[in-house]
């Protein structure tokens, strides 16, 4: 049971910052031709045409628990109906064969060539063991790769936000504008893929015992378009041959199915679906990890996923949710508009299911919240709708689900009615209470920690809001790629965050923050939270 602490008076204030109706990056980005001048950029550039054309890179994903590992890859569609296979084991000369399933890739996404996607699950993994594997592509086995499992009683994860390969489009590199065209002409994807690779290499050099990566979404940039060269660049990072990534569906991933082809997520549910897929969950070490597709605004379905996951893994010491949109962030472009659109609905659901930590992305800035829980009041429900052609969302207006009212997020100057409605929307989102705890180590808190990750590739950065919200404990924007390191045991959950300097060094940007559990029963006690939640708050 989470210990309830005395909470001091919280003065709620409306956030009245008006964001532009078209979200735009700043002039800041990570120029790989500069940061990589002495570390491989010339080779990456020389090989870019081949990289962009190779859609068959393998991706690794955590399995349903830490004894499993999931694989996914494309293979060219041929005359044979070979069953997808991964050969895996501790003896290179005697690998066990694991078979899986295959399906057709929508050829609108791949152009002239037809591909199949292949999904295989390997089972029986043990901690601290060296394995080897090969993958069959069109009947040919790939070179042998090494995969090492780490400790599970003390697990270490990298947490990253928005690699968004291709998002540097429009920036200037060596006098030329980076483009987001198809194939090798996508020079933005070339730039961002190199920086993504550099971030992973830097993080792993400092933390070679990482178990896996958690990505808070937007692996790639193009929205609702063919973008295989962006996935090819993302998956070309050398580290990913031996490093699973638990990805989240971001708004740039959401609108076509290639995400679901490239990533073989465990415990896929029918909840929270968009074209890219839906919610999923997995267990690792002492933690239950729940990944929600919050591009789908049906919170009742997300609640179903959380409850299903908790029922499947009731003994997990930690419950961690990953979402893309930052319902408690501090970035200028999203945190007080589309980022917080589900705040009033998700806050009580997270409280009621004893979630410990929520990992977010979307705003390309860094922030760490104070310990937060719901205020127990009834609030409105909000969402966005797809535009007429279904290729993106109408970001200019939030919809009040109960009344149907459209709320302009950037009212015209002098439109007092729209400004009043926007102010009311912001006021309604003051639906939280700040827990009265101090310091960077908290024990048995009632509240939840909300983290927002900056971009791991530096493909795009946003400004921070001019005024720091009262729920934010720390935040930064230094225009550098960043990552966090999570260390999780049975009784502690710690997070450290670093930026990567232009000379490739990892530099801390926040103090270590730790949540401790005292050894008392940490299973969900939903009575109090349920009493404060209205009957329809999760619909």
Regions found by a protein language model. Give the residues of each.
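Sec-dependent N-terminal signal peptides of Gram-positive bacterial secreted proteins and lipoproteins
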Residues: 2-23
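Sec-dependent signal peptide cleavage junction
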Residues: 16-32, 539
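Divalent metal-dependent phosphoesterase catalytic cores across multiple superfamilies
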Residues: 28-248, 254-275, 300-311, 337-353
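Ser/Thr/Gly/Pro-rich low-complexity, disordered linker/stalk segments of secreted
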Residues: 32-35, 522-539
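Extended active-site neighborhood of metal-dependent phosphoesterases/phosphodiesterases
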Residues: 116-122, 130-151, 172, 178-186, ...
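Active-site neighborhood of phospho(di)ester-bond hydrolases with catalytic His/Asp-centered motifs
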Residues: 159-161, 212-218, 245-251, 292-293, ...
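Active-site environment of divalent metal-dependent phosphoester hydrolases
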Residues: 165-169, 220-224, 251-257, 298-300, ...
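Short acidic, glycine-rich surface-loop motifs adjacent to enzyme active sites
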Residues: 217-220, 313-333
